[in-house]
C-alpha cells in the first residue's frame, strides 16, 4: 500500500483546522503533607491570603500562610480523604457564605450549609466572610435602645442599637441565658437575630434552638453552629460567617443583633490553627494577631447612617439607618478578667456586663454585678421612661453593697443605715428575674416606679417578687390602656404617675 504525500498533507491540514483553540489556564498545586486539619501545598504561585482552595471530594480550605515555596492552608471540614500528592486548585475567590432573609429560622454551619435537616437554604446572595468595617463618616451615634427585657440590664447598663456590649463571667453564671433572653425579647421589634455557637456541645446548641422555637423566636433568628466536634478552622471562621449574615440586614437599613457564644473558644481555636501553622507564639501561647482577630470582627458591629445605606443599596432604600448590635461572650477562669483575651475584648467593646459566681450561687439571677458593669454609650439610647425611673436604683445598690459589707462587723446600726440596708435588699430582690421571661417596657416601668416610691419598703423581702408578679397581672387586667400608652409613647406623664400610684396603692390593699 502506497501513501500519496498530497493525501498526508491534506490529512494534517484538516486535523490542524479542526483543532479546538480553547485552552484552560488553572493555578494548581500539590499536597505535600496533611495533618490535624492543616495542609502544606507546593505550587499555587498566584494564591491570595484568605483565598478559598478546592481539594478533592468537594472539600474547601483557606490559604493562611503564604511562604516562599509552599502554602499553609486550613481544611474546612473532613480531611481524612485528602492525601499526599493530591491536586489542589485555586478558586480565585475569598471565602463566601450565603446571606439574606432566606436564612431566618435555619441552623447552618460555619460555611452557611444547612444542618437542621430542613432542605437547602436557597439564598440568592453570597458575601465574603471578611469585610472592612464601616468608616467614621459612614457611622451614626448610638441613640436607639435595644431592649433586652431584663430589668437589671435595661435599668443599669442599657444597650443601644449598634453597640458592642460584652457579657463576661465564669462558666455556669448565666451568660448564654442573658443573651437568649435578649433574642426572645426582640419578637415584634423588626430585629433579625444571629446566634453564633462556637465550640459548644451539639446537645447544648440543640437545647438553645428548642428554647428559641418554643418562644417563637426562631422565625427571626439564624443559628450558626460550629460545635466542639468540628475542626478548629470551622470554629474560628464561624464568627465571621455570622457577622457577614448580620451585615446584610445592617447595610439595607434594618436592625440586627448578633451573639458570639463565645469568643474565648474562638481565640483558643485560632491559637490551635496558628500553632499548627508554625506561627510564633506570644503571651499565653496566643499568636501576635489575636487582638486583631477580635477587633476586626467587633468593629463590624455599628450603626450606619442613611447616606451609607442609600449608597450601598444604590438608592433603593432612602432615609433609613441600619445597625448591627453585638453581644460577645467571654468566659473567664476563676474570675480573672486580667487575662489576655478578656482584657483585649473589654478594650474593644463599648461596655461590659459582669456576671459573678458568688451572686449566682446566692440566688441573685441574673448574677449581674452592678458596681463594675458599665455601658459606655447606651445611656444616650436608653428609653426615656426607664431612664427617668432607674436613676436612683444604681446608687441604692452601690450604697447597699458598701453598707452590707460594713454592717457585718457593726453590732448596732442607726435608723438611716438600717433603712438603706432594708431598701437595698428589696431592690436586689426586685432585680431578680426568671429565665425566658423578658419584660415589656411598660411592666418594667411599673416595677421601677413602685420601688422608687417605696411601695416595697414595708414588705418582707421574700414577698417582693410575688407582689411584683401580682401587680403586673393587676395592671394588665385593670389598667391595660395605661400600659399601652407607656408602651407607645415611652414616657410617663405627671397625670399617668398619679393614676399609676393610685393603682399600685389599690392593689397593695388587697395583697
Curated annotation (Swiss-Prot):
Provide the residue positions that the database annotates as binding ATP. Answer: 169-176
The name this protein goes by in its record:
ATP synthase subunit alpha
Q: Which UniProt keywords apply?
A: ATP synthesis, ATP-binding, Cell inner membrane, Cell membrane, CF(1), Hydrogen ion transport, Ion transport, Membrane, Nucleotide-binding, Translocase, Transport
**Organism of derivation:** Herminiimonas arsenicoxydans
Q: Which NCBIfam families match?
A: atpA (TIGR00962), PRK13343.1 (NF009884)
The annotated subunit structure for this chain is:
F-type ATPases have 2 components, CF(1) - the catalytic core - and CF(0) - the membrane proton channel. CF(1) has five subunits: alpha(3), beta(3), gamma(1), delta(1), epsilon(1). CF(0) has three main subunits: a(1), b(2) and c(9-12). The alpha and beta chains form an alternating ring which encloses part of the gamma chain. CF(1) is attached to CF(0) by a central stalk formed by the gamma and epsilon chains, while a peripheral stalk is formed by the delta and b chains.
Q: Which family does it belong to?
A: Belongs to the ATPase alpha/beta chains family.
Q: Name one GO cellular component term.
A: proton-transporting ATP synthase complex
* A Pfam family recorded for this sequence: ATP-synt_ab_N
Which PROSITE patterns did the record assign?
ATPASE_ALPHA_BETA
Amino acid at each position: 500500500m502506497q501513501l500519496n504525500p498530497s493525501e498526508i498533507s491534506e490529512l494534517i491540514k484538516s486535523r490542524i483546522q479542526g483543532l479546538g483553540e480553547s485552552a484552560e489556564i488553572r493555578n494548581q498545586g500539590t499536597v505535600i503533607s496533611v495533618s490535624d486539619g492543616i495542609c502544606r501545598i507546593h505550587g499555587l504561585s498566584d494564591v491570595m491570603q484568605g483565598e478559598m482552595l478546592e481539594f478533592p471530594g468537594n472539600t474547601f480550605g483557606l490559604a493562611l500562610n503564604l511562604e516562599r515555596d509552599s502554602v499553609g492552608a486550613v481544611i474546612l471540614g473532613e480531611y481524612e480523604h485528602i492525601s499526599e500528592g493530591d491536586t489542589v486548585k485555586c478558586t480565585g475567590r475569598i471565602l463566601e457564605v450565603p446571606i439574606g432573609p432566606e436564612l431566618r429560622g435555619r441552623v447552618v454551619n460555619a460555611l452557611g450549609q444547612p444542618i437542621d435537616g430542613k432542605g437547602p437554604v436557597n439564598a440568592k446572595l453570597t458575601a465574603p466572610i471578611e469585610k472592612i468595617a464601616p468608616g467614621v463618616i459612614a457611622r451614626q451615634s448610638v441613640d436607639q435602645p435595644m431592649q433586652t427585657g431584663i430589668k437589671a440590664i435595661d435599668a443599669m447598663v442599657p444597650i443601644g442599637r449598634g453597640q458592642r456590649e460584652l457579657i463576661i463571667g465564669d462558666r455556669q453564671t448565666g451568660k448564654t441565658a442573658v443573651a437568649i433572653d435578649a433574642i426572645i425579647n426582640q419578637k415584634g421589634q423588626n430585629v433579625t437575630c444571629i446566634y453564633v455557637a462556637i465550640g459548644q456541645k451539639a446537645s447544648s446548641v440543640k437545647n438553645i434552638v428548642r428554647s428559641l422555637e418554643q418562644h417563637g423566636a426562631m422565625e427571626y433568628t439564624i443559628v450558626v453552629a460550629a460545635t466542639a466536634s468540628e475542626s478548629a478552622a470551622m470554629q474560628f471562621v464561624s464568627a465571621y460567617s455570622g457577622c457577614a449574615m448580620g451585615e446584610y440586614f445592617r447595610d439595607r437599613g434594618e436592625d440586627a443583633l448578633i451573639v458570639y457564644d463565645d469568643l474565648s473558644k474562638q481565640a483558643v481555636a485560632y491559637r490551635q490553627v496558628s500553632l499548627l501553622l508554625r506561627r510564633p507564639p506570644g503571651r499565653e501561647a496566643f499568636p501576635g494577631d489575636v487582638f486583631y482577630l477580635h477587633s476586626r470582627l467587633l468593629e463590624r458591629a455599628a450603626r450606619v447612617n442613611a447616606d451609607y445605606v442609600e449608597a450601598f443599596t444604590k438608592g433603593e432604600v432612602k432615609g433609613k439607618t441600619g445597625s448591627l448590635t453585638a453581644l460577645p461572650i467571654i468566659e473567664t477562669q476563676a474570675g480573672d478578667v486580667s487575662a489576655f483575651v478578656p482584657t483585649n475584648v473589654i478594650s474593644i467593646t463599648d461596655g461590659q456586663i459582669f456576671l459573678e459566681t458568688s451572686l449566682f450561687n446566692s440566688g441573685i439571677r441574673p448574677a449581674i454585678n452592678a458596681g463594675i458593669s458599665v455601658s459606655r454609650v447606651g445611656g444616650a439610647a436608653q428609653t426615656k421612661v426607664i431612664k427617668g425611673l432607674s436613676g436612683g436604683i444604681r446608687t441604692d445598690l452601690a450604697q447597699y453593697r458598701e453598707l452590707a459589707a460594713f454592717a457585718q462587723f457593726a453590732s448596732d446600726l442607726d435608723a438611716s443605715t438600717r433603712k438603706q440596708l432594708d431598701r437595698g435588699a428589696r431592690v436586689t430582690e426586685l432585680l431578680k428575674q426568671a429565665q425566658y421571661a423578658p419584660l415589656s417596657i411598660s411592666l418594667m416601668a411599673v416595677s421601677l416606679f413602685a420601688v422608687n416610691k417605696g411601695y416595697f419598703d414595708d414588705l418582707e423581702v421574700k414577698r417582693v417578687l410575688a407582689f411584683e408578679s401580682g401587680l403586673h397581672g393587676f395592671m394588665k387586667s385593670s389598667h391595660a390602656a395605661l400600659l399601652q400608652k407607656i408602651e407607645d409613647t415611652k414616657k410617663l406623664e405627671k397625670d399617668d404617675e398619679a393614676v399609676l400610684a393610685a393603682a399600685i396603692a389599690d392593689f397593695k390593699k388587697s395583697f
